[in-house]
Amino acid sequence: MAEGEDVPPLPTSSGDGWEKDLEEALEAGGCDLETLRNIIQGRPLPADLRAKVWKIALNVAGKGDSLASWDGILDLPEQNTIHKDCLQFIDQLSVPEEKAAELLLDIESVITFYCKSRNIKYSTSLSWIHLLKPLVHLQLPRSDLYNCFYAIMNKYIPRDCSQKGRPFHLFRLLIQYHEPELCSYLDTKKITPDSYALNWLGSLFACYCSTEVTQAIWDGYLQQADPFFIYFLMLIILVNAKEVILTQESDSKEEVIKFLENTPSSLNIEDIEDLFSLAQYYCSKTPASFRKDNHHLFGSTLLGIKDDDADLSQALCLAISVSEILQANQLQGEGVRFFVVDCRPAEQYNAGHLSTAFHLDSDLMLQNPSEFAQSVKSLLEAQKQSIESGSIAGGEHLCFMGSGREEEDMYMNMVLAHFLQKNKEYVSIASGGFMALQQHLADINVDGPENGYGHWIASTSGSRSSINSVDGESPNGSSDRGMKSLVNKMTVALKTKSVNVREKVISFIENTSTPVDRMSFNLPWPDRSCTERHVSSSDRVGKPYRGVKPVFSIGDEEEYDTDEIDSSSMSDDDRKEVVNIQTWINKPDVKHHFPCKEVKESGHMFPSHLLVTATHMYCLREIVSRKGLAYIQSRQALNSVVKITSKKKHPELITFKYGNSSASGIEILAIERYLIPNAGDATKAIKQQIMKVLDALES
């Protein structure tokens, strides 16, 4: 069930008894938001109580004066712009002359101090003046005005709320999920959400709506205490304009943008109840992953978006976590339920699949279009029947599952695009594919007695393919140590708690047609006519060097490894360190420099540089917006490299595994992948430098 579904719709009762209860609760003091919510129940607030309620909702009631320690000097480089914007705002308010000067100073001080304390450069496009408008009408003292403004900026204005910003790519995915036809139309006209909704989000509608309407919207929004709810309010406003937009196809791009941008201005007080009710409905029909996977858009900058987070502008559709897929279909009654479509090749599906998944071989789309069309027809019929019968496999929401490997999932992406082109609503993709599902089941110890997921995996036999212990040992035996693996021809090895057992898994897996490395779309499509390479333990050509620890080896990459560990073993300070690329390349201790692309587990790539010194290897990731500069993305000691591997199909894709060794075996601590031109020369040079380090340690 999507988060926020429990919040009741706006009631229609107009009795004033609740207003008296509210006033008494506020007068008594110590009132929290939950208490207020129970009294107000979403109704528009009385004007004389609004300030107190908002301060409690924003958690600033009783907070001290943040500006007390400030010298009050208005001396920012952009101060003239701030003053001009504030003056223009005061003129619009029709404030008595004797109060205008004081209010002007308050507003200018709030903006100036916020810029100074947060180290932000002010510009008119930021919508801050509009954001202050509803607060100014509350006639708050300067300290409260600042505290409320700060709280709204921190909790309700998303990070990167700018042209081409991440919040707007996310909004497009939400539009596509619920209104694919409208999304397709806007895409065709190259109208992106930031072109019309920048100030919707940046001012929480205050830029376009009257003060009265804005305050009514904020009354409900602040009581929800859910920053993501603004997305659903925006969606309803957009959906409300859908019919007009689609019937005026002759309008130019600029005309459509102007029309959309001003749509909120037509809202009146009577519309607010329906606006919230409809937004709540769409919210309840949205997967929880929409919020959970993007929670870092809001809140403290300490939880900011990492550079390696998925680029939402490149996302084909909304991604759903495998944990949500499993949990959703165990729910009873209303809520988001998924009809899972497994798009892997037949041999992989037969080896093991989610027991409730419908199989749709994505290869058929190119190899046998007529059979593919029939399969799609069967899929939709099966979905309909499963919903009608109340089956656990039933769900309105189509979720496509691939292998989790970008090279193979390209074909699934074509299938996804097919459904999106048909304007099919509620289309999503399982994040990480079947590989992520297996990993999740291993992580939660799927055979444990206290969970209900044990029946989720099926195989060709039709019976449950349990996650059995390796080497045929009893699940309860002492040698098992709780480490499980799918061994009935499963296509990837699961993460285990012991390297020794992990090594055993390798020799048990015969079919390795589900490699784990997910590549970006820039790489050439795999040749589907070629025979898949089967891997056995004999393929492990790398051997320890003279027993030196840690063990280091070079060889072809095992295409079933799933013990992925994020390579970010650095501190936050390291991650933020910015350096000049050329200065570092020219350092006397840098022995080798290799331009490359860092490849994250998600498949996304970042232009980078590998620098090798006598003892360390550094990865400098280029900062796109600051030419010539880079982040120190990784700093690894050469003696911690335990394995370097490459792919048969993509020899330029090099994987470095870092760790240490003990009597029980090798412990992998970090994994990094790079796409390196002339990879052979690079790995040779790095290997030679590693050998020098190991020789020095040995001697």
Curated annotation (Swiss-Prot):
A Pfam family that the UniProt record links to this protein: RabGAP-TBC
Region (Disordered): 459-483
Main subcellular location: Golgi
Domain of life the protein comes from: Eukaryota
Modified sites of kind Phosphothreonine: T514
Region (May mediate the interaction with C17orf75, FAM91A1 and WDR11): 514-573
Biased composition annotated in UniProt, kind: Polar residues: 459-479
Rab-GAP TBC domain boundaries: 44-225
SUPFAM superfamilies: Rhodanese/Cell cycle control phosphatase, Ypt/Rab-GAP domain of gyp1p
GO biological process, one term: brain development
May mediate the interaction with WASHC1 as annotated region, ranges: 514-699
UniProt cross-references to InterPro entries, sorted A to Z: Rab-GAP-TBC_dom, Rab-GAP_TBC_sf, Rhodanese-like_dom, Rhodanese-like_dom_sf, TBC1D23, TBC1D23_C
Region described as May mediate the interaction with FKBP15 and WASHC2: 574-699
Keywords per UniProt: Cytoplasmic vesicle, Developmental protein, Disease variant, Golgi apparatus, Phosphoprotein
GO cellular component, one term: cytosol
Keyword ATP-binding: no
UniProt subcellular location: Golgi apparatus, trans-Golgi network; Cytoplasmic vesicle
Modified residues (Phosphoserine): S300, S469, S474, S507, S520, S571
Biological role: Putative Rab GTPase-activating protein which plays a role in vesicular trafficking. Involved in endosome-to-Golgi trafficking. Acts as a bridging protein by binding simultaneously to golgins, including GOLGA1 and GOLGA4, located at the trans-Golgi, and to the WASH complex, located on endosome-derived vesicles. Together with WDR11 complex facilitates the golgin-mediated capture of vesicles generated using AP-1. Plays a role in brain development, including in cortical neuron positioning.
Associated disorder: Pontocerebellar hypoplasia 11: A non-degenerative form of pontocerebellar hypoplasia, a disorder characterized by structural defects of the pons and cerebellum, evident upon brain imaging. PCH11 features include severely delayed psychomotor development with intellectual disability and poor speech, microcephaly, dysmorphic features, and pontocerebellar hypoplasia. PCH11 inheritance is autosomal recessive.
Protein name: TBC1 domain family member 23
Organism of this sequence: Homo sapiens (Human)
